[in-house]
Amino acid sequence: MASELHVDAIKHSGGTSAMTIDSSGRMTLPAQPRFLVTLSSNTTVPDGHDQDWSVSAASWTEKFDVGGCFGSGLFTSPVAGVYHITYQMYCNPSAGSYIGAGMNGTAITDTYGLTNLWHFQAGGNDTGFTHTALVDVAAGKTIQFGTYGNGSSTARTDGTFIYGYKIA
């Protein structure tokens, strides 16, 4: 025999709302981890591999950060689960050069068995690319966002951002 539970909201015993279901069946999860940050100012992409560029060279403007997942250029999973992470860079590499972006850290190593996930784009004039990954991680795992440049380049504020959210 099947049972039905008729509720409008689910809350923690302390009163924190965990989930709301409206009359159409749409759910809201107000505490579900998610973040969006944008590059605060145009930033040099160094020649060669800079594994921790998001931490050491770039500064970020936080648009939102539910769950405190992003700080000082580093994503940290606040709770275990599967996260969708996107890193987009818009820059102007010099002619004949290329630009790359990497994701590395314990979340990448645990999920993919790799130290870095890479994405490369040919240079010359303005170029942009998006680098996306799913990670299945325990709480406290991290991702930092790196670059790999060949020639001079500048990451631009009008198209460089990082976002992520927990999907399961």
Tell me the role of every PLM-derived stretch.
Residues 22-97, 115-121, 153-168:
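Terminal (often C-terminal
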Residues 112-130:
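Extracellular carbohydrate recognition and processing domains
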Residues 2-30:
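Beta-strand-rich receptor-binding modules of extracellular spikes/adhesins
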Residues 18-20, 74, 134:
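Short, surface-exposed charged micro-motifs
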Residues 96-108:
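Short, surface-exposed beta-strand/strand-loop-strand elements in extracellular ectodomains
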Residues 81-91, 128-131, 141-148:
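Extracellular beta-strand-rich recognition modules
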Residues 135-139:
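Surface-exposed, short loops/turns at beta-strand junctions within beta-sandwich domains
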